Design a protein with these regions (language model features):
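Donor nucleotide-sugar binding/catalytic pocket of nucleotide-sugar-dependent glycosyltransferases
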Residues: 47-48, 127-178, 188-191
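Nucleotide-activated donor-binding/catalytic signature segment of Leloir-type glycosyltransferases, i.e.
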Residues: 225, 234-253
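Short His-centered aromatic/hydrophobic patch
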Residues: 82-88, 107
Length: 281
């Protein structure tokens, strides 16, 4: 269960395919953005759940919980694997209501809302929801950074033996193979991520601006990623464009094939908040 199909393909598809090879039936409950047929062709049973990643409408969230509950009751899965915070929160509530106990909540990062100094109404609401949804002796957590482990342990939600720390989601080394640095006269520094505050986009741009007088013409800072408008931490496209500098800070948008971008870069930077080892690094 995850918010959106493209994230599943990017971060969890190999796990699902391996489970199918071992004889499991794999159902994906996610929002369909056009990848349903592709995933069904891989042997995955796709159920469309209209998750809203911005989460601004409580009635819509209740609708998603009800749809998850209905499917959990109907299919009685042996294991429910929630991926991302939103899916884990809504899915855990649905799992409790449907009597499902074998739940794994895999959260790659609690994100910008849990960085130091952020303690507003939204943060307090999310913490309250975490305490309600995740409290269960039978639930397990897979987390990717020590800060999140400390937070979940501090809530006393599950036994400590049910909390696992991993270093990242991993990459396919058959696709991303070693290559020599380009060795060009103009150094290229790459930011390979969505244009989000919790990915450190402003830190990247600010660092580039600090070096501008010394290195313009010698270095190019490149941002490769889309402005994820559904994410609360997005830096808007208009604001981003106002920060670009010709032939120095460049935005190339979403790139379906990242390997050529990596091989053409000398340095890769991702100053993100509350992540483990990001897949892009």
């Amino acid at each position: 269960v995850t918010n959106v199909d493209w994230f599943f393909i990017s971060h969890r598809l190999p796990i699902a395919l391996n489970a199918i090879q071992q004889g499991y039936e794999v159902y994906l409950l996610s929002r369909d953005t056009g990848r349903k047929q592709f995933l069904q062709g891989k042997g995955i049973r796709f159920i469309d759940i209209p998750f809203d990643r911005s989460g601004s409408n409580p009635l819509h969230e209740l609708k998603c919980i009800f749809q998850l509950y209905t499917n959990y009751k109907k299919y009685r899965p042996n294991i429910i694997h929630h991926v991302t915070l939103k899916a884990a929160l809504l899915g855990s509530v649905a799992a409790k209501l449907s009597g499902q106990h074998h739940v794994v909540n895999a959260i790659s990062g609690l994100g910008y809302n849990f960085t130091n100094g952020r303690n507003g109404i939204l943060q307090k609401l999310i913490r309250t929801l975490i305490r309600i949804a995740f409290k269960s002796k039978s639930f397990s957590f897979i987390l990717q950074n020590p800060d999140d482990v400390g937070m979940i342990k501090g809530f006393n939600l599950v036994p400590s033996s049910h909390i696992f720390l991993i270093k990242g989601s991993g990459v396919d080394l058959n696709e991303f193979v070693f290559s020599q640095a380009p060795g060009k006269t103009q150094l290229k520094v790459l930011f390979p991520a969505r244009i989000l505050l919790d990915k450190g986009v402003m830190e990247f741009i600010d660092a580039a601006k600090l070096l501008q007088k010394r290195f313009i013409g010698k270095v190019k800072f490149i941002l490769a990623g889309d402005c994820d408008k559904e994410n609360l931490a997005v830096l808007g496209e208009e604001k981003l464009r106002s920060l670009l500098v010709d032939d120095y800070i460049e935005w190339i948008g979403y790139q379906a094939q990242m390997f050529p971008i990596y091989t053409d870069s000398d340095i890769v930077v991702l100053p993100s908040y509350r992540e483990g080892l990001p897949k892009s690094l």
